[in-house]
Amino acid sequence: MAVVVDIVTLKRRLPATRLVLFAWWWTIAETGGLVVAGWLFVRGRSNDATAHYRLMGNWANWLMRGMRVCLGATIEVMGAEALEGGGSVVLSRHVSLADSLLSAWAITQCGVEPRYVLKRELLADPCLDVVGLRLPNHFLDRSAADGGEELAAIGALTRDVEPESGTVVVIFPEGTRANSAKRQRAVAKIRETSPERAARLESLTALLPIRPAGTNALLDAAPGIDVIFARHTGLDGMDTFSGMWRRLASGVGPIELSFTRVVGSEVPMGDDRLAWLDQRWLEMDAEVSKRLQQQ
């Protein structure tokens, strides 16, 4: 049926066919992940973090292979050495439905174990609901009445992360998938309380302003921890299923993922940190915008 749709609508790149193939590929990943998770439960290994991280890595690797085979994506990772040894907080750009998958694949390929701050709604995914809750992640309840409890739970993720621990904590500090309308609303909201900050962020063209609460919770709980900035291009416009359809119709193209590490001694404390984060975010925005223009 998908092939018929593509032929009737004269879609040369077969977007419907590609989406259906990837849906089947994803179904295989979900089924396999749940079977292995069930086997670990039966064997009394529900608390075996190493086994579950291995499962996560295999799951992510299978799905990224599916993106190559079914969607025609090519993937290049730059600066992967920044992940070596772990012991850091990863601040990642957020623009598509595949961002957490992309980062999980890249990080586990380096032999590092990622802990995630994700929205609770993602627990609708069966594998995340089972495996994600067995690992030290935090699924954020964005409607929680007590934001302090949520921030405390986020901070707990870095409290035992030591240098060379082989562990990183990943957060998407924009708080939602970026697009131009959200960017305008975010800057306007900041302007209500901090005109100075809004003025320096008005030049953003690809990223959203950082929502600092979660990032501060992670950094405050582990003073001196290194910070890794993760930027990627190639998934822009794929923030909705309709967006994925449009991208597939025109071609996914190359996906580039880059990591840059900043040692903890260079990360400001207190009130100076937000201006520093904003400046680094503006630098990332400029690089992302440059890459997008070249694609």
What are the language-model segments listed below?
Residues 1-88, 102:
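Membrane-anchoring hydrophobic helices of lipid-metabolizing enzymes
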